[in-house]
Amino acid sequence: MGIFFLQLVRSAIVPLRSEGKWVTRAFLTIAVLALAQVLAGSLWAQEQDSKKILGQRLVDEIAAKHKPDLIYLGLHSQAPKSKKSVIFASTDSGKIGKNSSCADLHVVEKGIPVMEMKGKSTTVLERLLDSSGHTVGLIVVGFNYTDGQEAEAAKLGKQVSEELAQQIPSKNKLFETGK
């Protein structure tokens, strides 16, 4: 984006060269400002990412990797020093902090995955594991799959679950900020 902008500005300024050195200075000023804006945006994004908890960073990373098939990803668990299981990381920020339902908790307790077909989407619920195989919560994954695509949904649900587990050292680490 920044390079394209610079080329666009340069093509607009070059015909004005006959006006003197101010054109060159104007171009350099604009180039420096554009570069500063690009760098500032990158630094801001890094700063925002470092403020997120590990769980949210993993959700963002996995969701981006599996688009467009993955349309929702949410992680449920009890935060340290909490007695309630809530959604603590999600692709839908409006759901963060909402209590886990009894059905959600049943999946965690019994360890039996659930697949729900809802019109044009499929939702898979299963235990969220850490890298040692310990249960740390619940994963809810929504896919852009319809009736007849249950096998694909189950396969991708398992893949997402395994990708998450490999990156979770422990339950408490899910709630820590920073990289």
PLM features: residue spans?
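Juxtadomain coupling helices with adjacent low-complexity linkers
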Residues: 49-56, 143-179
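A short beta-strand signature within small-molecule sensing/ligand-binding domains used
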Residues: 120-127
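Short glycine-/small-residue motifs
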Residues: 137-138
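N-terminal secretory signal peptides that target proteins for export/translocation
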Residues: 1-25
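Bacterial N-terminal signal peptides
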Residues: 26-40
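Boundary at the C-terminal end of the N-terminal hydrophobic targeting segment
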Residues: 43-47
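Extracytoplasmic/periplasmic sensor domains and loops in membrane signaling proteins
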Residues: 90-116, 155-159
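Short N-terminal helix-loop-first-beta-strand/juxtamembrane motif that initiates sensory/input modules
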Residues: 60-81, 174
